[in-house]
Regions:
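ATP-dependent adenylation/nucleotidyltransferase module used to activate substrates
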Residues: 1-147, 157, 166, 173, ...
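AMP-forming adenylation/ATP pyrophosphatase catalytic core
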Residues: 115-122, 127-352
Length: 352
């Protein structure tokens, strides 16, 4: 059988390196593709990618995506914080950049398949691919891929879906490649920290009130964009028990604070609902993950007569955060996702 071409998104890190290595060993004609993005240390990163590609004897193509990344990912990120939301830029990047523009460039270069070093699996049935969790949950990245449409996944390969991170490191070391201690950061463009980044993009330190749920002002802050729901540090509110951020009003530059129990909510409204297949009839019941490090919890997705979509959990959840993505799972399979609009006001029944 004639070998097929596969384009591998290469970053110079251990995951994409081993993904390319495994595909080459399986008989694919591997071509590396590097996204040039407006990131700190990008020249050093490109040099590392070239070294790795040379070591693997795979050709490398550099795709300049600096402007689209700025327009679609960074601008959205900054605007979200300005509005008092907590965004997840990796979700936008995967949907629009990595599996959008980069994948399109690969296909235009006659690649038969698109591959990345993500820890996730694909289940193929009826000619379509659906996303599922990686075999090893500790590094599962299906949450970050949940906005991808079926047509974006049909020609995709995830070579590391069955691998543990430790096994990937060991495989790289058999080639004399050592990556331990080089774990990538959560948000690739925040090398100098969130506050410095947002300040450099025009978010100023405008003073505003710290208020309790009843509207009482108990302190001041220097910019609501410095906070996220559930945050404790930086409030400057000494007390016998800690205060936490429970809500952010970006328009009024106001941060609402409360005690630990005030972070517990049992439901929230969502928007931008995306189902990977045909939308199911509601209510839908399954597991819902509120953020990347949240343990999925039993919940149902319902719609009221006005069309507002709401998630109701079987038990209260901590720090439901507007702007974050929720991902819907049936067992290990991703079936949908949505963006959190705002937490429903707490009632006595919301608290444990």
């Amino acid at each position: 059988m004639t070998a097929l071409n596969v384009g591998v998104a290469m970053s110079g890190g251990v995951d994409s390196t081993v993904a390319a290595l495994l595909l080459s060993e399986q008989g694919w004609r591997v071509h590396g593709f590097f996204m040039r993005l407006p990131l700190p240390g990008r020249d050093a990163q490109l040099q590392r990618v070239r070294e790795v590609a040379g070591r693997l004897a795979v050709p490398l193509t550099v795709i300049d995506l600096e402007q689209p990344f700025t327009d679609r990912v960074i601008r959205s990120f900054v605007d979200s914080y300005r509005a008092g939301l907590t965004p997840n830029p990796c979700m936008h990047c995967n949907e629009q950049i990595k599996f959008g523009l980069l994948a399109e460039a690969m296909r235009a270069a006659d690649m038969d398949r698109v591959a990345t070093g993500h820890y996730a699996r694909l289940v193929r049935a009826g000619g379509r691919a659906s996303l599922a969790r990686a075999a090893h949950r500790a590094k599962d990245q299906s949450y970050f891929l949940a906005r991808l449409r079926p047509e974006q996944l049909d020609d995709v390969l995830f070579p590391l879906g069955e691998w543990s991170k430790e096994a990937v490191h060991r495989r790289a070391e058999t080639l004399g490649l050592h990556f331990r201690g080089e774990e990538s950061q959560d948000v690739c463009f925040l090398a100098n920290g969130l506050s410095a980044f947002l300040a450099s993009h025009g978010l100023d330190r405008t003073a505003g009130p710290l208020v309790t749920a009843d509207g009482s002002t108990i302190g001041q802050h220097t910019g609501c964009w410095q906070f996220t729901v559930g945050q404790r540090r930086g409030l400057g509110l000494p007390d016998a028990t800690p205060w936490y951020v429970t809500a952010i009003d970006g328009a009024a530059n106001r941060v609402v604070v409360g005690k630990a129990a005030d972070l517990m909510r049992q439901e929230c409204n969502v928007h931008a609902v995306h189902w990977t297949d045909a939308p199911p009839s509601l209510p839908w019941r399954g597991l819902v993950q509120l953020r990347s490090r949240h343990t999925p919890a039993a919940a149902e997705v319902i719609a009221d007569p006005a069309g507002t979509v709401r998630i109701v959990f079987a038990a209260p959840q901590r720090a439901i955060t507007p702007g974050q993505f929720t991902v819907f799972y049936e067992h290990d399979r991703v079936v949908g996702s949505a963006v959190i609009s705002r937490p429903t006001p707490a009632t006595a029944g919301d608290r444990p």
